[in-house]
Design a protein with these regions (language model features):
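Protease-labile, long low-complexity intrinsically disordered regions enriched in Pro/Ser/Thr
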Residues: 1-204
Length: 204
């Protein structure tokens, strides 16, 4: 069904939808960068159904995190980030955003993700995942979500990070350009223990 919202499911590293449509929160990944090696617990309060987590979520994730972002679980397994995917009925906000030609997606995302606070490695992983789903479209209507996402997917991180950056992109493929008010993109300075999350949803 072309009206369904979907996402591919690999590996936390709008026009109003019809009521019967689902929204897939695609590949939210979370990175943890403490100042010293620290045991950290991450819990997710999600207004929807989790469909996949890695490592296994259970009642939360507890890992030992290093300043370089390496995460180690109780069994000694290491991870680059925490991953989850879920399905919800969240209505994303497309009152402001960007209409971007598919051919200009990579350049747009490089600039936007930097303004939103992702470092080069994080932005690279974001772009590698999303670019194949966007560059062949004639245009993409893109809006980076604030409360619509953060209020439906609430994170509790213990100990609490000094800096929390959450980047969530909703986009809709278009066959022709549309006018939309531009969105202001800002980010806090990355100081102290920093936690970063990125994800997205493709809306059809």
């Amino acid at each position: 069904d072309k009206d369904e919202v979907w996402s591919a499911k690999p590996v936390i590293y709008l026009y109003p939808e019809e009521d019967e449509d689902e929204t897939c929160d695609a590949k939210p990944v979370a990175y943890l960068y403490p100042q010293t090696e620290t045991e950290i617990t991450v819990r997710l309060d999600y207004d929807g159904e989790l469909t996949c987590t890695y490592p296994a979520y259970a009642d939360g994730w507890t890992v030992s995190a290093r300043p370089d972002g390496t995460l180690t679980d109780k069994n000694g397994q290491t991870y680059r980030y925490l991953y989850w995917e879920g399905v919800s009925e969240t209505e994303y906000d497309f009152s402001a955003g960007f209409c971007v030609p598919g051919s200009g997606t990579a350049e747009f995302l490089e600039d936007a993700l930097s303004k939103l606070g992702l470092n080069r490695a994080e932005a690279n992983e974001f772009i590698i995942y999303w670019l194949p789903r966007m560059q062949e479209n004639a245009y993409n209507l893109i809006a980076f979500q604030q409360e619509a996402y953060t209020e439906s997917a609430r994170l509790t991180i213990t100990p609490e990070p000094d800096t929390l950056i959450r980047v969530f992109m909703a986009f809709r493929p278009l066959t022709a350009p549309v006018e939309i008010a531009p969105q202001a993109l800002t980010a806090p300075a990355r100081t102290g223990f920093t936690a970063v999350e990125w994800g997205g949803a493709e809306c059809r």
